[in-house]
Swiss-Prot record:
Name of the encoding gene: LMCPA
Family according to the record: Belongs to the peptidase C1 family.
Organism: Leishmania mexicana
CDD domains in the record: Peptidase_C1A
Taxonomic placement: Eukaryota, Discoba, Euglenozoa, Kinetoplastea, Metakinetoplastina
Top-level taxon of origin: Eukaryota
Designated name of the protein: Cysteine proteinase A
Length: 354
C-alpha cells in the first residue's frame, strides 16, 4: 500500500485548497495551538489511553505530533461539516508517517494492484429502489475486530466479506479466521500486505474454498509477527469463487442490498483522527487499506455508506466509519470485490477463480 511523505502530503493539501478555494482558505487555516491548551488535552489523552513514555525525547516527540494533529483535526473539521475529527482517539500521538507505516501497509497496493485482474459482474435486474440497508441488523456482520500492528487489513476485509456472504445466503453467522490467511496464504505477504481477491484466489486454489473458524484458528498476529502456518482447524464456511464488481457506486449498492457486504480498498490516510459522522471530503490519492461495506442509507443528508474497519471498537463510531455516497469518497469504488457462496436461497452467480 502506498507510502507518502507527510511533508509532501501537507504541501499538496495546501496547494489543492488554495487552487480550489482561493482566499476562502485563509479563514480555514488552522490557528496556532497554545502550548498550555495542547498540554491539557495531551494529559487527558495519555490518561484515557494509558500512555507512558520512557524519556524526555520520546515524550517531546509525541507531544509535538499530538499538537500537530490538533491542527490537522481543525482543518479536516472545516472541510467536513457532517463529520468530526478529534485528538481523543488512540492514534493522536502518531505522526502521519508513523500512522501510515503501522496501519496502512505502505507500498503494497502501488506494487501489486496493477496485477489485479478484473472480471466485472453486472447484475442486469432492475434496481429495487431500496433506500437503506444495514447488514448488522440482519445478523450478517461479526463484531469489530482489531488487526493490531500487523498490516493484515486485506485479510480482515476478505474474511469479513466471506462471513457476510455466508450469513446473507442463509447460513448461520460464524466468525472466521483471518490468521489462516495471514499465516498460510502464500500469494499475499502476511503482515506486509495483501489483496482481497488474491486471498480469495488462494482459498479457492489451495484450500478448496474452505475457511476455518476463528475459534479453531484464532488471530495471533496483532503484535506484527507472522506465525508459521499449521493449516488445521474447523471449517466454518466455504466459498465457490469470487468476482470484481463494477467501479460504480450504484452497482455496488445493488450488490450490498441484494447479496450482502462487499470488500473494498480505500485511501485511509485521513482516518487517523476520525471520530464520527459522515465524511464528505476524504482527500484521497491512492489505495492503502482494506475494509468492508456493510450497508448504506440514501435517505440521510448526506447519504452515506456504512463501513466496517479493523482497528478495534474504540476507533471511530464503535469501529465503523460513514462515507458520503456518490462522490467516491476515499476512492471507495475503485476496488470492490466479493466472494460467492452457494445457497438454495439465492440464484447462481457467475464466478471467477483466477
Amino acid at each position: 500500500m502506498a507510502r507518502r511523505n507527510p511533508l509532501l502530503f501537507a504541501i499538496v493539501v495546501t496547494i489543492l485548497f488554495v487552487v480550489c478555494y482561493g482566499s476562502a482558505l485563509i479563514a480555514q487555516t488552522p490557528p496556532p495551538v497554545d502550548n498550555f491548551v495542547a498540554s491539557a488535552h495531551y494529559g487527558s489523552f495519555k490518561k484515557r489511553h494509558g500512555k507512558a513514555f520512557g524519556g524526555d525525547a520520546e515524550e517531546g516527540h509525541r507531544f509535538n505530533a499530538f499538537k500537530q494533529n490538533m491542527q490537522t483535526a481543525y482543518f479536516l473539521n472545516t472541510q467536513n461539516p457532517h463529520a468530526h475529527y478529534d485528538v481523543s482517539g488512540k492514534f493522536a500521538d502518531l505522526t502521519p508517517q508513523e500512522f501510515a507505516k503501522l496501519y496502512l501497509n505502505p507500498d503494497y497496493y502501488a506494487r501489486h494492484l496493477k496485477n489485479h485482474k478484473e472480471d466485472v459482474h453486472v447484475d442486469d435486474s432492475a434496481p429495487s429502489g431500496v433506500m437503506s440497508v444495514d447488514w448488522r441488523d440482519k445478523g450478517a456482520v461479526t463484531p469489530v475486530k482489531n488487526q493490531g500492528l500487523c498490516g493484515s487489513c486485506w485479510a480482515f476485509s476478505a474474511i469479513g466479506n466471506i462471513e457476510g456472504q455466508w450469513a446473507a445466503s442463509g447460513h448461520s453467522l460464524v466468525s472466521l479466521s483471518e490468521q489462516m490467511l495471514v499465516s498460510c496464504d502464500n500469494i499475499d505477504e502476511g503482515c506486509n500486505g495483501g489483496l482481497m481477491d488474491q486471498a480469495m484466489n488462494w482459498i479457492m486454489q489451495s484450500h478448496n474454498g474452505s475457511v476455518f473458524t476463528e475459534a479453531s484458528y484464532p488471530y495471533t498476529s496483532g503484535g506484527g509477527t507472522r506465525p508459521p502456518c499449521h493449516d488445521e482447524g474447523e471449517v466454518g464456511a466455504k466459498i465457490t469463487g469470487f468476482l470484481s464488481l463494477p467501479h460504480d457506486e450504484e452497482r455496488i449498492a445493488e450488490w450490498v442490498e441484494k447479496r450482502g457486504p462487499v470488500a473494498v480498498a480505500v485511501d485511509a490516510t485521513t482516518w487517523q483522527l476520525y471520530f464520527g459522522g459522515v465524511v464528505s471530503l476524504c482527500l484521497a490519492w491512492s489505495l492503502n487499506h482494506g475494509v468492508l461495506i456493510v450497508g448504506f442509507n440514501k435517505n440521510a443528508k448526506p447519504p452515506y455508506w456504512i463501513v466496517k474497519n479493523s482497528w478495534g471498537s474504540s476507533w471511530g463510531e464503535k469501529g465503523y466509519i460513514r462515507l458520503a455516497m456518490g462522490s467516491n469518497q476515499c476512492m471507495l469504488k475503485n476496488y470492490p470485490v466479493s466472494a460467492t457462496v452457494e445457497s438454495p436461497h439465492t440464484p447462481h452467480v457467475p464466478t471467477t477463480t483466477a
